């Protein structure tokens, strides 16, 4: 493994007379970057582990370790350098994390023995179903003869994100073709088509003793990728409570420290159907960086480091978050993008990626004010990313 340092020496760090643990993060993309920055603002140190030596979080990490998350020996060596480990994504095998934690006595949050309950789409659906939480009707596809002549979605159980690993099909002929193409990639599910009027997201965080919520937001998807997030989301108090009740049930059952995001469909009769979850900070939570006095990233790092959680308080009555998605393939012109977006009643976060490509997440913008929606749409339509 290769060790890269961003400081000449490491000193003991304290916050309110409490020594803070060194937190290790597996993964070095934008989520890792924002987690790192949040913990450093609290006075903590963060070591980051990733196989890409040029990953975005390298520029902010106190120590950056180049290694592979599918290599147990390299994971063990990294675990020995930190006090606690957390995750940027859910694509790391939970058994490897369990083995590395046992060999080093290093805590991992979320606890991999608990996060294994939801680490792929099949186990996640089974877990939610067993709790009595409404989910989209589905079945596992083991052979082409299992498929039915109805519209729906074929989904890979593991590794999907931003529409990748999800395939819309209108009939059995299409389903047969897609299944034969993807069946060698892993377990495949068929999910029935569901009519809904909104897609919503709720974030919750636990430190084992306390549970905090970020209220529902609406996510607006375009071609399988989140384009906008809006608060408030225009639902009733009853719908908000439905979400809290479901999330509380899940969080209590998981019984682990960390932050989780839950994505729901809202049906025409105002019932929530749980779509999926993520055991980490989430794209829909980037709005919390400017909407609340405590972001999802700060509360997540508080939860895994043993600090008191913060009850998030609103700083604005309303906000729209825009994902800045790549519009071309090539070098990313950061100064030009910042100039084109402007700075009136908004906050822009760029992710430090050197190259853009079509639909790649390059940053986000949080916009407030009465004209937030026209400005959000203008950014999408006119700014070259």
Where are the regions that the model predicts?
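A conserved helix-loop-beta module that forms one wall/lid of the active-site cleft
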Residues: 111-167, 172
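Phosphate-binding core of ATP-grasp and ATP-grasp-like enzymes
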Residues: 182-235, 240-274, 278-286, 298-311, ...
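A conserved FAD-binding loop/helix module that cradles the flavin
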Residues: 289-290
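Peripheral (often C-terminal) accessory segments that flank ATP-dependent C-N-forming ligase machineries
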Residues: 1, 11, 19, 302-385
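ATP-binding N-terminal substructure of ATP-dependent carboxylate-amine bond-forming enzymes
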Residues: 2-119
């Amino acid at each position: 493994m290769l060790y890269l340092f961003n400081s000449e020496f490491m000193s003991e760090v304290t916050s309110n007379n409490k020594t803070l643990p060194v937190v290790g993060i597996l993964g070095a993309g934008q989520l890792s970057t924002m987690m790192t920055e949040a913990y450093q603002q609290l006075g903590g140190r963060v070591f980051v582990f990733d196989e890409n030596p040029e990953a975005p979080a390298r520029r902010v990490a106190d120590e950056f370790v180049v290694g592979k998350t599918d290599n147990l020996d390299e994971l063990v060596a990294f675990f020995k350098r930190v006090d606690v480990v957390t995750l940027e994504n859910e694509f790391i095998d939970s058994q490897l994390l369990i083995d590395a934690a046992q060999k080093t006595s290093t805590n991992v949050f979320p606890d991999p023995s608990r996060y294994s309950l939801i680490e792929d789409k099949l186990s996640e659906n089974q877990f939610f179903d067993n709790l009595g939480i409404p989910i989209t009707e589905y079945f596992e596809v083991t052979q082409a003869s299992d498929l039915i002549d109805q519209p729906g979605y074929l989904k890979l159980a593991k590794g999907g994100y931003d529409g990748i690993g999800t395939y819309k099909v209108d009939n059995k002929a299409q389903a047969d073709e897609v299944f034969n193409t993807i069946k060698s990639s892993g377990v495949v599910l068929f999910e029935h088509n569901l009519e809904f009027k909104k897609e919503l997201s709720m974030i919750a965080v636990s430190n084992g003793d306390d549970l905090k919520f970020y209220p529902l937001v609406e996510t607006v998807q375009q071609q399988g990728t989140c384009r906008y997030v809006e608060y408030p989301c225009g639902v009733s108090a009853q719908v908000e409570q439905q979400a809290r009740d479901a999330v509380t049930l899940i969080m209590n059952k998981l019984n682990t420290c960390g932050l989780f995001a839950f994505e729901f469909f809202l049906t025409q009769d105002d019932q929530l159907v749980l779509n999926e979850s993520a055991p980490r900070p989430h794209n829909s939570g980037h709005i919390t960086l400017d909407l609340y006095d405590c972001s999802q990233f700060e509360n997540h790092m508080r939860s895994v480091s043993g600090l008191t959680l913060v009850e998030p308080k609103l700083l604005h009555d309303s906000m729209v978050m825009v994902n800045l998605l790549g519009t071309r393939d090539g070098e990313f012109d950061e100064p030009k993008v910042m100039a084109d977006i402007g700075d009136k009643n908004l906050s822009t976060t760029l992710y430090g990626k050197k190259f853009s490509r079509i639909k790649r997440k390059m940053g986000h913008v949080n916009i407030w004010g009465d004209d937030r929606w026209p400005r959000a749409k203008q950014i999408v339509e006119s700014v070259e990313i």
